[in-house]
């Protein structure tokens, strides 16, 4: 879990998904593998930063849920796995808990921390924790009344819409720009400002950064889990997640289209967004879409989200 680029969680998720689709004899062996690997992962978070834990942990929690760990291994679930998950509520990783990371960082750090935070809340069916995390996510999608405590990098302010900047000298951005946002007359509707600022101050045409799809990778996992628990997350922020991908695809006014052809471990963002909105981003890719590769925190979505 301490390796920010580790992919083991994706393969644990694959074993869990295959296990629930096969006959009982083969399935039992795969489920045992999942439990074994989860056990081996415990403790590997020592020395990690919050981003690494945020990226890696969710897949293990989702895999445990898929195989119904409380039913097949109640002893391991109660005495090992659940106490470990509970520890993440207060444990600090380079000064941040998953909770404070989601609440402070309006970028890929925060979205991945939020995904693991929400996955844990879902596993425990902790409605209070999930509601609190959902409020932060709704704020991330643009509703400052829901939450507005994010700390932006200085360059992010140059990507904020002209309307906001004209309204007050103290204008505060929202992590995903609102519908119709413009900067100097250029379309920035849906820009994830604290990831796009990795390219520097506002410039046009804008430059590509893989941090934008990286941030959306954590966001779609948050939205997917929250939706399963009754939150209308895909509609929040005037369909902010769809608008964010639309801006990446926007190819007018000298801005090139940015899909995930050269960024395969972000392909799952397009699968999940298409599944949620009935959109066709996969069909609109510049390359022939391949089956989804291991992602930043989940994977195999070209199979699970058809």
Regions found by a protein language model. Give the residues of each.
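Aromatic-lined, polymer-binding surfaces characteristic
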Residues: 2-229
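CBM-like carbohydrate-recognition segments
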Residues: 207, 228, 233-306
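N-terminal module-boundary/linker segments of secreted carbohydrate-active enzymes
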Residues: 1, 108, 302-306
């Amino acid at each position: 879990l301490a390796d920010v680029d580790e992919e083991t969680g994706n393969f644990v998720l694959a074993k869990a998904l295959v296990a629930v689709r096969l006959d009982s004899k083969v399935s039992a062996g795969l489920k045992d593998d999942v439990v074994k690997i989860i056990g081996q992962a415990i403790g590997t978070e020592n020395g990690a930063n919050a981003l690494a834990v945020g990226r890696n942990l969710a897949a293990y929690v989702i895999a445990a849920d898929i195989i119904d760990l409380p039913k097949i291994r109640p002893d391991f679930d109660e005495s090992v796995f659940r106490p470990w998950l509970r520890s993440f509520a207060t444990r600090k990783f380079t000064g941040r808990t998953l909770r404070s990371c989601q609440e402070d960082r309006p970028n890929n750090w925060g979205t991945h921390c939020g995904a693991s935070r929400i996955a844990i809340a879902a596993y425990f069916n902790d409605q209070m924790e999930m509601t609190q995390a959902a409020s932060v996510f709704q704020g991330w999608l643009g509703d400052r009344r829901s939450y507005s405590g994010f700390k932006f990098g200085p360059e992010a302010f140059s990507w904020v819409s002209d309307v906001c900047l004209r309204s007050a000298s103290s204008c505060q951005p929202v992590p995903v720009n609102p519908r119709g946002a413009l900067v100097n007359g250029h379309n920035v509707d849906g820009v994830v400002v604290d990831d796009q600022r990795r390219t520097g101050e506002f410039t046009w045409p804008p430059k590509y950064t893989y941090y934008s799809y990286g941030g959306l990778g954590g966001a779609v996992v948050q939205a997917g889990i929250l939706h399963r628990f009754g939150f209308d997350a895909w509609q929040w922020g005037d369909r902010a997640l769809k608008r964010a991908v639309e801006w990446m695809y926007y190819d007018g006014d000298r801005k090139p289209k940015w899909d995930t052809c050269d960024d395969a471990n972000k392909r799952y963002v397009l699968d999940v967004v298409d599944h949620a909105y009935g959109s066709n981003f996969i069909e609109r890719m510049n390359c022939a879409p391949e089956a989804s590769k291991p992602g930043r925190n989940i994977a195999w979505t070209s199979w699970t989200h058809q």
